[in-house]
Protein backbone atom coordinates (compact mmCIF):
# COMPACT_ATOMS: atom_id res chain seq x y z
CA UNK A 1 0.00 0.00 0.00
CA UNK A 2 1.17 3.52 -0.81
CA UNK A 3 -0.13 6.84 0.58
CA UNK A 4 -2.18 9.02 -1.77
CA UNK A 5 -0.99 12.22 -0.02
CA UNK A 6 -4.40 13.83 -0.36
CA UNK A 7 -4.34 13.63 -4.15
CA UNK A 8 -7.42 11.39 -4.37
CA UNK A 9 -10.78 11.03 -2.65
CA UNK A 10 -11.83 7.57 -1.35
CA UNK A 11 -15.19 6.25 -2.43
CA UNK A 12 -15.24 2.46 -2.05
CA UNK A 13 -13.58 -0.43 -0.28
CA UNK A 14 -12.46 -3.87 -1.40
CA UNK A 15 -11.24 -6.98 0.41
CA UNK A 16 -10.21 -10.48 -0.54
CA UNK A 17 -13.10 -12.77 0.40
CA UNK A 18 -13.83 -16.47 0.08
CA UNK A 19 -17.31 -17.67 -0.92
CA UNK A 20 -19.02 -20.87 0.22
CA UNK A 21 -22.52 -22.34 0.50
CA UNK A 22 -24.05 -22.76 3.95
CA UNK A 23 -25.62 -26.08 2.95
CA UNK A 24 -22.16 -27.45 2.06
CA UNK A 25 -19.84 -25.50 4.36
CA UNK A 26 -21.55 -24.29 7.54
CA UNK A 27 -18.17 -23.90 9.30
CA UNK A 28 -15.75 -22.03 7.07
CA UNK A 29 -11.95 -22.33 7.48
CA UNK A 30 -10.63 -19.42 9.54
CA UNK A 31 -6.89 -19.55 8.82
CA UNK A 32 -4.45 -21.01 6.27
CA UNK A 33 -3.96 -24.27 8.16
CA UNK A 34 -7.72 -24.76 8.41
CA UNK A 35 -7.98 -24.11 4.67
CA UNK A 36 -5.34 -26.77 4.07
CA UNK A 37 -7.28 -29.23 6.24
CA UNK A 38 -10.50 -28.32 4.40
CA UNK A 39 -8.85 -29.02 1.05
CA UNK A 40 -7.59 -32.37 2.36
CA UNK A 41 -11.09 -33.28 3.56
CA UNK A 42 -12.63 -32.30 0.20
CA UNK A 43 -9.96 -33.02 -2.43
CA UNK A 44 -10.53 -31.48 -5.83
CA UNK A 45 -13.11 -28.95 -4.63
CA UNK A 46 -10.76 -26.06 -3.78
CA UNK A 47 -8.61 -23.91 -6.07
CA UNK A 48 -7.70 -20.30 -6.84
CA UNK A 49 -7.40 -18.20 -10.01
CA UNK A 50 -4.19 -18.61 -11.95
CA UNK A 51 -1.76 -15.73 -11.36
CA UNK A 52 -1.29 -13.14 -12.79
CA UNK A 53 -5.06 -12.85 -12.44
CA UNK A 54 -5.47 -10.02 -9.92
CA UNK A 55 -7.41 -12.10 -7.39
CA UNK A 56 -5.09 -15.08 -7.79
CA UNK A 57 -2.10 -12.89 -6.99
CA UNK A 58 -4.00 -11.36 -4.06
CA UNK A 59 -4.46 -14.89 -2.70
CA UNK A 60 -0.68 -15.34 -2.79
CA UNK A 61 -0.22 -12.01 -0.99
CA UNK A 62 -2.80 -13.01 1.62
CA UNK A 63 -1.00 -16.25 2.38
CA UNK A 64 2.38 -14.52 2.46
CA UNK A 65 1.10 -11.88 4.91
CA UNK A 66 -0.14 -14.54 7.30
CA UNK A 67 2.66 -17.09 6.91
CA UNK A 68 5.93 -15.18 6.64
CA UNK A 69 8.00 -14.66 9.79
CA UNK A 70 9.11 -11.31 8.35
CA UNK A 71 5.91 -9.32 7.64
CA UNK A 72 7.70 -5.98 7.97
CA UNK A 73 9.74 -6.86 4.88
CA UNK A 74 6.55 -6.67 2.82
CA UNK A 75 6.25 -2.93 3.43
CA UNK A 76 9.30 -2.35 1.25
CA UNK A 77 10.14 -3.55 -2.26
CA UNK A 78 11.46 -7.13 -2.28
CA UNK A 79 15.22 -7.54 -2.04
CA UNK A 80 17.08 -10.26 -3.89
CA UNK A 81 19.12 -11.11 -0.80
CA UNK A 82 16.08 -11.79 1.40
CA UNK A 83 13.33 -12.77 -1.07
CA UNK A 84 13.84 -16.52 -0.65
CA UNK A 85 13.74 -16.40 3.15
CA UNK A 86 10.71 -14.09 3.30
CA UNK A 87 8.67 -16.17 0.84
CA UNK A 88 9.80 -19.70 1.81
CA UNK A 89 6.72 -20.39 4.01
CA UNK A 90 4.42 -19.45 1.11
CA UNK A 91 5.98 -21.94 -1.32
CA UNK A 92 6.11 -24.65 1.34
CA UNK A 93 2.39 -24.12 1.95
CA UNK A 94 1.51 -24.19 -1.75
CA UNK A 95 3.57 -27.34 -2.29
CA UNK A 96 1.32 -29.03 0.28
CA UNK A 97 -1.90 -27.41 -0.96
CA UNK A 98 -1.63 -27.94 -4.72
CA UNK A 99 -1.98 -31.76 -4.78
CA UNK A 100 -5.29 -31.33 -2.94
CA UNK A 101 -6.72 -28.79 -5.38
CA UNK A 102 -9.00 -29.08 -8.39
CA UNK A 103 -7.11 -31.04 -11.05
CA UNK A 104 -4.41 -31.57 -8.40
CA UNK A 105 -3.07 -28.06 -8.94
CA UNK A 106 -1.97 -28.83 -12.51
CA UNK A 107 -4.53 -26.37 -13.90
CA UNK A 108 -6.19 -23.28 -12.46
CA UNK A 109 -9.36 -21.35 -13.35
CA UNK A 110 -8.71 -18.23 -15.41
CA UNK A 111 -10.81 -15.92 -13.25
CA UNK A 112 -13.00 -15.56 -10.15
CA UNK A 113 -16.03 -15.52 -12.47
CA UNK A 114 -15.09 -19.01 -13.63
CA UNK A 115 -14.80 -20.11 -10.00
CA UNK A 116 -18.26 -18.69 -9.27
CA UNK A 117 -19.67 -20.82 -12.08
CA UNK A 118 -17.86 -23.88 -10.71
CA UNK A 119 -19.23 -23.19 -7.23
CA UNK A 120 -22.74 -22.90 -8.63
CA UNK A 121 -22.39 -26.16 -10.58
CA UNK A 122 -21.07 -28.01 -7.54
CA UNK A 123 -17.58 -28.59 -8.92
CA UNK A 124 -16.04 -26.40 -6.21
CA UNK A 125 -16.91 -25.80 -2.58
CA UNK A 126 -15.19 -22.41 -2.48
CA UNK A 127 -14.89 -19.41 -4.76
CA UNK A 128 -12.98 -16.17 -4.22
CA UNK A 129 -13.54 -12.48 -4.88
CA UNK A 130 -12.11 -9.08 -4.00
CA UNK A 131 -15.45 -7.72 -2.81
CA UNK A 132 -16.84 -8.74 0.60
CA UNK A 133 -20.39 -8.08 -0.65
CA UNK A 134 -19.97 -10.08 -3.88
CA UNK A 135 -21.68 -13.22 -2.56
CA UNK A 136 -24.74 -11.26 -1.45
CA UNK A 137 -24.91 -9.37 -4.74
CA UNK A 138 -24.59 -12.49 -6.90
CA UNK A 139 -27.02 -14.48 -4.74
CA UNK A 140 -29.56 -11.66 -5.05
CA UNK A 141 -29.20 -11.67 -8.85
CA UNK A 142 -29.40 -15.47 -9.10
CA UNK A 143 -25.83 -15.84 -10.37
CA UNK A 144 -24.87 -17.75 -7.20
CA UNK A 145 -27.00 -20.07 -5.04
CA UNK A 146 -29.17 -18.32 -2.45
CA UNK A 147 -27.21 -19.82 0.45
CA UNK A 148 -23.87 -18.39 -0.73
CA UNK A 149 -21.96 -16.31 1.80
CA UNK A 150 -18.62 -14.56 2.11
CA UNK A 151 -16.00 -15.22 4.77
CA UNK A 152 -12.35 -14.65 5.56
CA UNK A 153 -9.58 -15.56 7.96
CA UNK A 154 -10.23 -14.42 11.52
CA UNK A 155 -6.92 -12.53 11.76
CA UNK A 156 -7.79 -10.43 8.72
CA UNK A 157 -7.92 -10.36 4.94
CA UNK A 158 -6.04 -8.32 2.36
CA UNK A 159 -7.91 -5.18 1.36
CA UNK A 160 -7.66 -1.73 -0.16
CA UNK A 161 -9.64 1.39 -1.02
CA UNK A 162 -10.47 2.75 -4.45
CA UNK A 163 -10.42 6.47 -5.15
CA UNK A 164 -11.56 9.19 -7.50
CA UNK A 165 -9.15 11.84 -8.72
CA UNK A 166 -9.49 15.13 -10.60
CA UNK A 167 -7.01 15.51 -13.49
CA UNK A 168 -4.73 18.54 -13.29
CA UNK A 169 -6.08 19.77 -16.64
CA UNK A 170 -9.77 19.26 -15.77
CA UNK A 171 -11.99 22.08 -17.07
CA UNK A 172 -14.61 21.90 -14.30
CA UNK A 173 -12.74 21.20 -11.08
CA UNK A 174 -15.42 22.80 -8.91
CA UNK A 175 -18.09 20.52 -10.34
CA UNK A 176 -15.82 17.51 -9.99
CA UNK A 177 -15.36 18.30 -6.30
CA UNK A 178 -19.13 18.40 -5.87
CA UNK A 179 -19.39 14.93 -7.41
CA UNK A 180 -16.54 13.60 -5.24
CA UNK A 181 -18.23 14.98 -2.13
CA UNK A 182 -21.56 13.45 -3.16
CA UNK A 183 -19.93 10.05 -3.60
CA UNK A 184 -18.84 10.27 0.05
CA UNK A 185 -22.31 11.15 1.31
CA UNK A 186 -24.12 8.56 3.47
CA UNK A 187 -26.92 8.41 0.91
CA UNK A 188 -24.60 7.56 -2.00
CA UNK A 189 -22.45 5.19 0.05
CA UNK A 190 -25.51 3.31 1.30
CA UNK A 191 -27.01 3.07 -2.17
CA UNK A 192 -23.91 1.57 -3.74
CA UNK A 193 -23.32 -0.76 -0.75
CA UNK A 194 -26.74 -2.34 -1.20
CA UNK A 195 -26.11 -5.77 -2.81
CA UNK A 196 -29.31 -5.47 -4.83
CA UNK A 197 -27.94 -2.26 -6.40
CA UNK A 198 -24.17 -2.73 -6.65
CA UNK A 199 -22.60 -4.16 -3.51
CA UNK A 200 -19.57 -1.85 -3.34
CA UNK A 201 -18.44 -1.44 0.30
CA UNK A 202 -18.59 1.91 2.05
CA UNK A 203 -15.53 3.88 3.20
CA UNK A 204 -17.42 5.83 5.88
CA UNK A 205 -16.54 5.54 9.57
CA UNK A 206 -19.67 4.14 11.28
CA UNK A 207 -18.80 6.09 14.44
CA UNK A 208 -19.35 9.34 12.53
CA UNK A 209 -22.80 8.39 11.25
CA UNK A 210 -26.12 9.06 12.92
CA UNK A 211 -27.86 6.14 14.63
CA UNK A 212 -30.42 6.04 11.82
CA UNK A 213 -27.66 5.91 9.20
CA UNK A 214 -25.82 3.15 11.06
CA UNK A 215 -28.99 1.07 11.23
CA UNK A 216 -29.51 1.53 7.49
CA UNK A 217 -25.97 0.32 6.75
CA UNK A 218 -26.29 -2.60 9.17
CA UNK A 219 -29.39 -3.74 7.31
CA UNK A 220 -27.47 -4.28 4.04
CA UNK A 221 -23.82 -4.81 5.05
CA UNK A 222 -22.60 -8.01 6.81
CA UNK A 223 -21.35 -7.38 10.34
CA UNK A 224 -18.88 -10.28 10.38
CA UNK A 225 -16.42 -8.93 7.79
CA UNK A 226 -12.89 -9.69 9.06
CA UNK A 227 -10.30 -6.98 9.79
CA UNK A 228 -8.58 -5.47 6.76
CA UNK A 229 -4.88 -6.17 6.20
CA UNK A 230 -2.89 -3.62 4.22
CA UNK A 231 -1.41 -4.75 0.93
CA UNK A 232 2.32 -5.40 0.56
CA UNK A 233 4.40 -2.88 -1.36
CA UNK A 234 3.28 -2.85 -5.00
CA UNK A 235 6.61 -4.25 -6.18
CA UNK A 236 5.78 -7.59 -4.55
CA UNK A 237 3.08 -8.25 -7.15
CA UNK A 238 5.44 -8.86 -10.05
CA UNK A 239 8.00 -10.66 -7.87
CA UNK A 240 5.43 -13.14 -6.56
CA UNK A 241 3.86 -13.69 -9.97
CA UNK A 242 7.21 -14.41 -11.62
CA UNK A 243 8.25 -16.85 -8.89
CA UNK A 244 4.84 -18.58 -8.97
CA UNK A 245 5.08 -18.98 -12.74
CA UNK A 246 8.61 -20.35 -12.42
CA UNK A 247 7.52 -22.93 -9.86
CA UNK A 248 4.03 -23.89 -11.01
CA UNK A 249 3.30 -22.22 -14.34
CA UNK A 250 4.58 -25.01 -16.57
CA UNK A 251 2.33 -27.74 -15.12
Task: List the model feature ranges, each with a label.
Residues 42-45, 121-126:
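Alpha-to-beta junction loops
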Residues 157-158, 162-228:
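Mature extracytoplasmic/periplasmic domains
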Residues 113-123:
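Short helices/loops that flank or line small-molecule/ion binding pockets
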Residues 1-113:
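Extracytoplasmic ligand-binding site segments that recognize negatively charged/polar headgroups
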Residues 117, 222-251:
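Conserved C-terminal helix/tail region of periplasmic/extracytoplasmic solute-binding proteins
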Residues 126-145:
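A ligand-binding cleft/hinge motif common to bilobed small-molecule-binding domains
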Residues 14, 93-97, 108, 144-165:
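Periplasmic-binding protein-like
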Residues 33-36, 60-64, 91-95, 116, ...:
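Non-transmembrane alpha-helical segments in soluble domains
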Amino acid sequence: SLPTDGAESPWGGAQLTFIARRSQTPDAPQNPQALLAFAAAHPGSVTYPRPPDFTGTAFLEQLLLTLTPQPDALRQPPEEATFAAVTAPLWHYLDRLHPLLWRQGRDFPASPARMDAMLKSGTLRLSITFNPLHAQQKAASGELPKDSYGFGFSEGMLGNVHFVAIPANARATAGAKVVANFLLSPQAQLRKADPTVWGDPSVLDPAKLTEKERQAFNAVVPQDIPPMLGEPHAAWVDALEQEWLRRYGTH
